[in-house]
Amino acid sequence: MTVSCPPPSTSEREEQARALCLRLLTARSRTRAELAGQLAKRGYPEDIGNRVLDRLAAVGLVDDTDFAEQWVQSRRANAAKSKRALAAELHAKGVDDDVITTVLGGIDAGAERGRAEKLVRARLRREVLIDDGTDEARVSRRLVAMLARRGYGQTLACEVVIAELAAERERRRV
């Protein structure tokens, strides 16, 4: 004869959900939406998830604004992503649009252009440019594609690549 165990009480389920969230937050900071998704995936009711997440937010363990600021700082430094790419990543992580706008508001267009120029310059140093310019179109396509993968707009990418290619040709000529 099989004896079925009663389901854990609400407070037990809440404690299990809290423990899961704390375990997930140990590895890296997460957004409220990411934690809610993990709780739902594991079968926790929405009301329990909301109570647990509200408690964690009250003590400062879940803060989407802080997460977004850290994410932007890290991704701009390590991956050289553009504002557009960062906004898409934050949106995919469930950060509110108002928070995204606020966090990305501190990045000006000049800084973004400067970062694109730095990326192109670094890549151009490793490129072999033939003096007759036959492979310049190939190099140009590669550089524009590199910037596009990082979320830079086509107009900005083309302008930066043309200017940096001209500067690199001049530098190598001297």
Curated annotation (Swiss-Prot):
**Top-level taxon in the UniProt lineage:** Bacteria
Asked if the Swiss-Prot or TrEMBL record annotates the protein with the keyword Cytoplasm, the reply is yes
Q: Name one GO biological process term.
A: regulation of DNA repair
What compartments host this protein? Cytoplasm
Its Gene Ontology cellular component terms are:
cytoplasm; plasma membrane
Keyword annotations for this protein, in alphabetical order, are: Cytoplasm
InterPro entries listed in its UniProt record? RecX_HTH_1st (IPR053926), RecX_HTH_2nd (IPR053924), Regulatory_RecX (IPR003783), WH-like_DNA-bd_sf (IPR036388)
Which Gene3D superfamilies does its entry note? Winged helix-like DNA-binding domain superfamily/Winged helix DNA-binding domain
Q: What's this protein's function? A: Binds to RecA inhibiting ATP hydrolysis and the generation of heteroduplex DNA. It might act as an anti-recombinase to quell inappropriate recombinational repair during normal DNA metabolism. It is essential for cell survival.
Family label: Belongs to the RecX family.
Q: What is this protein called?
A: Regulatory protein RecX
Q: Which organism is it from?
A: Mycobacterium tuberculosis (strain ATCC 25618 / H37Rv)
